[in-house]
């Protein structure tokens, strides 16, 4: 049974459009404006419909798909939190991850880490690190549903912004 709010009304089309667009950040923003316009301009006599409209007005911020970002350093991503990161990547959820790869444990004063390249000298690795750098990007790509970009923040800020936009748009 259809709710009286949408039965044979233009709202039915608007709500269907939202259902089709709710998983896209850009599309859900566009369609949510139409939903908000429709509910704010509606006048209904049914008490249940009025209550529903008021609840939708209170929660209108939830109509737009949220962008979710996890931001951390390489010590977390490559080592301490890798199990959790791997779990999130394997889940298939639409989550973006930004890893600041300094190639050392920055919080410990520069010790070599799993992100330190082979032969690099660091604290407690004065003769150079013996093992090669863990390839986190390749490991993430093995899931097949992950967008990976590697950028040099100091080299080209436009490339960084482009990668962030591409990550956000990737489904």
Q: What does each model-found stretch correspond to?
A:
Residues 1-48, 52-55:
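N-terminal leader/propeptide and maturation segments of large enzyme subunits in energy/redox metabolism
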Residues 4-5, 62-64, 119-169:
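Conserved thiamine diphosphate
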Residues 13, 17, 37, 58, ...:
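Charged/polar, solvent-exposed surface patches and flexible loops
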Residues 43-46, 72-73, 114, 122-124, ...:
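Short linear motifs at secondary-structure transitions and domain/linker junctions
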Residues 46-49, 54, 66, 114-118, ...:
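A generic structural signal for ordered alpha-helices
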Residues 47-107, 111, 155-170:
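Thiamine diphosphate
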Residues 89-135, 145-147:
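Active-site cavity-forming subdomains of large catalytic enzyme subunits
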């Amino acid at each position: 049974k259809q709710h009286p709010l949408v039965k044979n009304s233009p709202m039915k089309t608007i709500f269907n459009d939202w259902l089709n667009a709710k998983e896209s950040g850009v599309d859900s923003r566009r369609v949510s404006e139409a939903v908000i316009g429709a509910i704010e301009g509606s006048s209904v006599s049914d008490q249940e419909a009025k209550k529903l409209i008021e609840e939708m007005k209170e929660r209108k911020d939830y109509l737009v798909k949220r962008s979710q970002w996890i931001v951390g350093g390489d010590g977390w991503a490559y080592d301490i939190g890798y199990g959790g990161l791997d779990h999130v990547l394997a889940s298939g959820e639409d989550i973006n991850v930004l890893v600041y790869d300094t190639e050392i444990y920055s919080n410990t004063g520069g010790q070599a880490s799993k992100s330190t390249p082979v032969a690099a000298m660091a604290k407690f690795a004065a003769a150079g690190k013996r093992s090669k750098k863990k390839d986190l990007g390749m490991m993430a790509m093995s899931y097949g549903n992950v967008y990976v970009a590697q950028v040099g923040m100091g080299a080209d800020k436009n490339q960084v912004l482009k990668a962030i936009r591409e990550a956000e748009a990737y489904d």
